[in-house]
């Protein structure tokens, strides 16, 4: 979760920060909740009451005032929402979203096309969470991709998915705080193995989630991550990118390797890392840098964060390494998801999702 060109003055300052204050506070909430083993809403209350100073807030939580009146003011842990999202049959709330054409349905059925969605679903934003979760899940049900890569999943969101998406197998990078997830359509994608690679110096609970699968006789290695956030953590983010690329290089030559996730990358950071290896491509660049799906974090178009500065960045990216015997799987198209506001007046996430279709050469 989570500027580029921004407007002058305050807008330029917003880009230098790389992420608004509200986002930093959500990360503090996650850290607090992890330490205190409490709900994120409880963490937010204690941090806000203590001027967002972690140590003061934790002391307040673990050593509350003994007066009865003070105890009564302590917020109760908020239980998991009782309404669950049905991934399998819910109508999309985006009336303008074009549906999959019959030819694409046929291509999926006969195995000549492979589809994926990657989306930072902004689970740390608790406002309108149930409505936004329904919005995200309606897109997943509409497009029914073979693989779904999600970032910023939180336990209640995971429960939505786990309880109502029986047609998908879900692998997560963690089970507490916030984490990534990979969802595999059981009818097409056969899981062979999975692994989690820790980022040893992360300050934000980040890691690399990998699964090895088989699709229509093709061996694939699928990866997702949520790289370190904010401008101030660029060095750590670049180290994490290097780990991702190294892992992609180490995958068996017989496998097609796909990484999809929220990289938080600025183009200059990729350049500073030496660029991508010769055998790994950025799918957006491979497809000719289409303008319609360039920016996945766009505060001019997306009002969820309430930022006045017009900031556009391509945080969410897909990296692709073909198998040694090239030509079996080829990226074909890329589109944005989640561009319409929901009935609650907000978008499903502060990020747009990415829908990628790939051709399988039979």
Swiss-Prot record:
Residue numbers marked as site, Interaction with 5' end of substrate DNA: 178, 297, 315, 351
Chief subcellular location: nucleus
UniProt entry keywords in alphabetical sequence: Acetylation, Cytoplasm, DNA damage, DNA repair, Host-virus interaction, Hydrolase, Intellectual disability, Isopeptide bond, Magnesium, Metal-binding, Neurodegeneration, Nuclease, Nucleus, Phosphoprotein, Spinocerebellar ataxia, Ubl conjugation
UniProt effect for mutating residue 316 to N: Strongly decreased phosphodiesterase activity
Region described as Interaction with 5' end of substrate DNA: spans on this chain: 120-124, 226-231, 264-266
Cellular component GO terms held in the UniProt record: aggresome; cytoplasm; nuclear body; nucleolus; nucleoplasm; nucleus; PML body
Effect of residue 350 to N: Strongly decreased phosphodiesterase activity
MF-aspect GO terms: 5'-tyrosyl-DNA phosphodiesterase activity; magnesium ion binding; manganese ion binding; nuclease activity; single-stranded DNA binding; transcription corepressor activity; tyrosyl-RNA phosphodiesterase activity
Record-listed Phosphoserine modification sites: 95
Active-site annotation: 262
PTM statement from Swiss-Prot or TrEMBL: Ubiquitinated by TRAF6.
Required cofactor names: Mg(2+); Mn(2+)
Outcome of substituting residue 206 to A/K: Loss of phosphodiesterase activity
Bias (Polar residues) ranges: 94-109
Residue numbers of N-acetylmethionine PTMs: 1
Protein name, entry field: Tyrosyl-DNA phosphodiesterase 2
Organism this protein belongs to: Homo sapiens (Human)
Encoding gene (name): TDP2
């Amino acid at each position: 979760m989570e500027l580029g060109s921004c407007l002058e003055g305050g807008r330029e300052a917003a880009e230098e920060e790389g992420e608004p204050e509200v986002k930093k506070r959500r990360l503090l909430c996650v850290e607090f909740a992890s330490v205190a083993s409490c709900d994120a809403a409880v963490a937010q209350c204690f941090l806000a009451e203590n001027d967002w100073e972690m140590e003061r807030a934790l002391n307040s939580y673990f050593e509350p005032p003994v007066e009865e009146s003070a105890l009564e003011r302590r917020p109760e842990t908020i239980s998991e929402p009782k309404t669950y999202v049905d991934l399998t049959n819910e109508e999309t709330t985006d009336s303008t979203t074009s549906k999959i054409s019959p030819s694409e349905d046929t291509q999926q059925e006969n195995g000549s096309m492979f589809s994926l969605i990657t989306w930072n679903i902004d689970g740390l934003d608790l406002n309108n969470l149930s409505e936004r979760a329904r919005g995200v899940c309606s897109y997943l049900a509409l497009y029914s991709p073979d693989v779904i890569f999600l970032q910023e999943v939180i336990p209640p969101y995971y429960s939505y998915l786990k309880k109502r998406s029986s047609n998908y197998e879900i692998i997560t990078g963690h089970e507490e705080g916030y984490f990534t997830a990979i969802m595999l359509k059981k009818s097409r994608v056969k899981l062979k193995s999975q692994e989690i690679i820790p980022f040893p110096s992360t300050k934000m609970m980040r890691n690399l989630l990998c699964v090895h699968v088989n699709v229509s006789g093709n061996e694939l290695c699928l990866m997702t991550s949520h790289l370190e956030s904010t401008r101030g953590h660029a060095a750590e983010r670049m180290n994490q990118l290097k780990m991702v690329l190294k892992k992609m290089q180490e995958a068996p030559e017989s496998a097609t390797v796909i990484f999809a996730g929220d990289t938080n990358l600025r183009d200059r950071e990729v350049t500073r890392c030496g660029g991508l290896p010769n055998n790994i491509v950025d799918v957006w660049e491979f497809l000719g840098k289409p303008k319609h799906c360039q920016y996945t974090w766009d505060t001019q178009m997306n009002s969820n964060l309430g930022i006045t500065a017009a900031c556009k960045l391509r945080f969410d990216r897909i990296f692709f390494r073909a198998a040694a015997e090239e030509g079996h799987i080829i990226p074909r198209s890329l589109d944005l998801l989640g561009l319409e506001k929901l009935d609650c007046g907000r978008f499903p996430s502060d990020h747009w999702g990415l829908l990628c279709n790939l051709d399988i050469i039979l």
